[in-house]
Every structure is written in structure tokens, then in C-alpha cells.
From Swiss-Prot:
Cofactor(s) recorded in Swiss-Prot or TrEMBL: Mg(2+)
EC number(s) given by UniProt: 3.6.1.9, 3.6.1.12, 3.6.1.-, 3.6.1.23
Stored InterPro entries: Nucleoside_triphosphatase_NudI (IPR023781), Nudix_hydrolase (IPR020476), NUDIX_hydrolase-like_dom_sf (IPR015797), NUDIX_hydrolase_CS (IPR020084), NUDIX_hydrolase_dom (IPR000086)
Signal peptide start-end: none
Name of the protein in its database record: Nucleoside triphosphatase NudI
Species of provenance: Escherichia coli O157:H7
Lineage, opening ranks: Bacteria, Pseudomonadati, Pseudomonadota, Gammaproteobacteria, Enterobacterales
Catalytic activity from the UniProt record: a ribonucleoside 5'-triphosphate + H2O = a ribonucleoside 5'-phosphate + diphosphate + H(+); a 2'-deoxyribonucleoside 5'-triphosphate + H2O = a 2'-deoxyribonucleoside 5'-phosphate + diphosphate + H(+); dUTP + H2O = dUMP + diphosphate + H(+); dTTP + H2O = dTMP + diphosphate + H(+)
Length: 141
């Protein structure tokens, strides 16, 4: 089984948290709301990976003013690729508290939508199990 280290930013701006709705045809949690993030590449430092994933998935205009390592977790997930292939992967999640100076987001093809959500509204979203676990641990659910 392949192992991946995943960096996940929990991005907050003015009391709201950024959620992204996964594309219906790919990823570990197709069609559900999630935190952004992705895999650390060989030779890449953790914060470099986090900043790269944010640029790739959320665009160049989203400006982070704070990045603080927060917690980690792990599990085994089945990933679905755009071509329909499936793969079981051991995932290690490194989760960061992040604060953004703005809300200028331009999502890539991995997502179909995004939202800035106040803590009291988070429970109204179809959150994937990993995001739900993270938000509970943070005391937001």
C-alpha cells in the first residue's frame, strides 16, 4: 500500500473558514465538502508543499498572513482518479491553522465550488469524514 503525506490548511478569514466542494469524479471524497490540501512531493519541505498546494488549488491571489502547525492524523482511504482507477492509500494528514488577509479564491479542477463558512453554519454542509473529524477536534462542530 502506498503512503502519502498530505498537508491541509484550515484557512480562516474574519471568523469564517474556507471549505471546498470536491469534484464528483475524483479524489478521496468525491462530491463532498473538504479542506483543501494535497501531497508533499519528494524533496519538498512541508511549508513549501502547503504553499504550493494552496497556489495550485486556490489560486495566486489568496494571501496567507499566518501559518501555524496544529495537529496530525492518519487513516487509510480509497482514492478515485479522473480515469476511474481506484487506489487504497495510507494517508498522513498534517493540519495547519492559517489566516488569510483576503477571500480571493480561484479553485482548480479538483473542486466544483467553495464557500467561506461561519462556525455555526459548518454542520449544514456535507463534510467528508476527515474534515468533520478535524473541525470537531478544533471545537468548531
Amino acid at each position: 500500500m502506498r503512503q502519502r503525506t498530505i498537508v491541509c490548511p484550515l484557512i480562516q478569514n474574519d471568523g469564517a473558514y474556507l471549505l471546498c466542494k470536491m469534484a464528483d469524479d475524483r479524489g478521496v471524497f468525491p462530491g463532498q465538502w473538504a479542506l483543501s490540501g494535497g501531497g508533499v512531493e519528494p524533496g519538498e519541505r512541508i511549508e513549501e508543499a502547503l504553499r504550493r498546494e494552496i497556489r495550485e488549488e486556490l489560486g495566486e491571489q489568496l494571501l496567507l498572513t499566518e501559518i501555524t502547525p496544529w495537529t496530525f492524523s492518519d487513516d487509510i482511504r480509497t482514492k478515485t482518479y479522473a480515469d476511474g482507477r481506484k487506489e487504497e492509500i495510507y494517508m498522513i494528514y498534517l493540519i495547519f491553522d492559517c489566516v488569510s488577509a483576503n477571500r480571493e479564491v480561484k479553485i482548480n479542477e479538483e473542486f466544483q465550488d467553495y464557500a467561506w463558512v461561519k462556525p455555526e453554519d459548518l454542520a449544514h454542509y456535507d463534510l467528508n469524514v476527515a474534515t468533520r473529524k478535524t473541525l470537531r477536534l478544533k471545537g468548531l462542530l
